Design a protein with these regions (language model features):
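Beta-lactam-recognizing serine transpeptidase/beta-lactamase-like catalytic domain environment
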Residues: 1-168
Length: 168
């Protein structure tokens, strides 16, 4: 439960759980720098509540991709790579010999039961394949050659002091 007397520790615990999936954490991508997203230091109890379902902290597209991949990998969070390896040039300037292969690096395993991970994965699947009005991803399944899943979301922007929400 939420410790109302110590909201800071409650938010910290929530964010630690999110970080297990790569949200608000470095992804481990093979670039010299990366953003960890935006996690405000000051917040209210209302912010804590909305953060619990994804409406307060802001994450990078790469963090969101890593989050989805972590769920797909049954909780195994893997560092993303931009390249498979580093190659030399051949005498004609083309692709030469492999100099360094980029190995898969597992960053962590999410602390979640197999049963609960299965529920999350089923929820992602139902976003595309469900039969209710909440099946917001149905159109992306048209013509699929492999089973796909998706995560719903709401992108919020603030322009000229007018808040806009875009549900996806």
């Amino acid at each position: 439960g939420v410790d109302l007397k110590n909201l800071d520790s409650s938010m910290e615990k929530l964010r630690e759980t999110f970080a297990e999936y790569g949200l608000g954490a470095k992804t481990g991508v093979d670039l010299p720098t990366e953003s960890q997203g935006y996690t405000p230091k000051e917040f209210t109890f209302a912010n804590y509540l909305t953060n619990a379902f994804g409406q307060f902290d802001n994450y990078t597209p790469l963090q969101l991709a890593q989050y989805a991949a972590t769920v797909a990998n049954n909780g195994k969070r893997v560092a993303p790579h931009l390249v498979e390896g580093i190659y030399a040039n051949d005498k004609n300037g083309g692709l030469g010999d492999l100099i360094e292969k980029k190995e898969t690096k597992v960053l962590n395993q999410v602390n979640i039961s197999e049963e609960n991970m299965k529920l999350i994965k089923e929820g992602f699947y139902q976003v595309v394949h469900g039969g209710s009005g909440f099946t917001t991803g149905r159109t992306i399944s048209q013509g699929e050659s492999v089973p796909i899943s998706a995560k719903t979301g709401t992108a919020e922007t603030l322009t000229k002091k007018i808040q806009q929400a875009n549900n996806t």
